[in-house]
Regions:
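Enrichment for repetitive, rod-forming helical segments
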Residues: 10, 134, 228-229
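Short, threonine-centered small-residue motifs that mark membrane-proximal processing/anchoring sites
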Residues: 2-9, 13-15, 19-25, 193-220
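C-terminal membrane-anchoring or membrane-association module
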Residues: 218-229
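Short, surface-exposed polybasic-aromatic patches that bind anionic ligands, especially phosphate groups
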Residues: 24-199
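Hydrophobic alpha-helical segments, especially transmembrane helices
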Residues: 4, 128, 223-225
Length: 229
């Protein structure tokens, strides 16, 4: 089995078990590829807010499983690197309470564009695009107008804002059959930043391997329980 296949299967198994749990432990190690600063203005129907923050993806771990990159979908909460949080629950992104009803589907399309996201500029652009999709309700994605606006900071001078705009513009001609989109919802009060990420939809052969792995884990679990009895 190739290493490139092991990681998606391991993450899929982690997601399978997490989806059955009431609460999950989530850790954020760092920005995955650095970040860029940006100024944000949110307007009604969002709770109005103006802030300056860093945009980028997070190196994330769910219940001690393999790391992956997640993105913030909650500009009203905060998080800390290196601190495990136990107030999260994993849900399909379609179940998350987005302000924008089309957000879950459009975030899936953003992933399906398969743009390279391997630098601080690209990851900042991806995060800004996700924020725009999350909070924009005017009917058109435009970083400079509407209910979610983004400007300035190093995102403006580095080209991250321009890149985000181009990716948002491509959504209208993009379809998504390749990615399942998930949300990590913080259930605390106060909570922490809700997150979103995507996993590739497995090929049928990968499903078979996952099923075999889960079956083996179940058999070993039953044998261990029998020995303890």
């Amino acid at each position: 089995m190739s290493r490139s296949l092991i990681a998606p299967i391991a993450l899929a198994c982690t997601l399978s078990f997490a989806a059955q749990a009431r609460a999950d432990t989530v850790s954020f190690a760092r920005f995955a590829n650095g970040s860029q600063s940006v100024d944000i203005a949110l307007g009604s129907p969002n709770v109005p807010k103006n802030l300056s923050t860093q945009a980028g993806g997070f190196t994330t771990s769910l219940n001690g499983g393999p790391s992956f990159v997640s993105y913030c979908i909650d500009l009203y909460e905060y998080l800390l690197f290196g601190t495990p949080f136990t107030d999260y629950t994993l849900v399909p992104a379609a179940s998350h309470a987005f302000t924008n009803a089309a957000a879950a589907a459009d975030i899936g399309k953003l992933y399906a564009e398969n743009n390279p996201v391997n630098s601080s500029v690209a990851q900042a652009a991806f995060q800004i695009a996700i924020w725009e999709i999350t909070y924009e309700t005017s009917g058109a994605y435009n970083l400079g107008t509407g209910t979610a606006m983004f400007s300035g900071g190093t995102a403006g001078t580095s080209g991250a804002l321009t890149l985000a705009s181009s990716w948002l513009g491509a959504l209208a001609t993009t379809t998504n059959n390749a990615y399942a989109v998930w949300a990590l919802d913080s259930i605390g009060n106060p909570g922490h930043q809700d997150q979103v990420f995507a996993t590739p939809v497995p090929e049928p052969s990968t499903y078979a391997l996952m099923a075999a792995g889960l079956l083996c884990m179940g058999v070993f679990g039953r044998r261990r329980a029998a020995r303890q009895d």
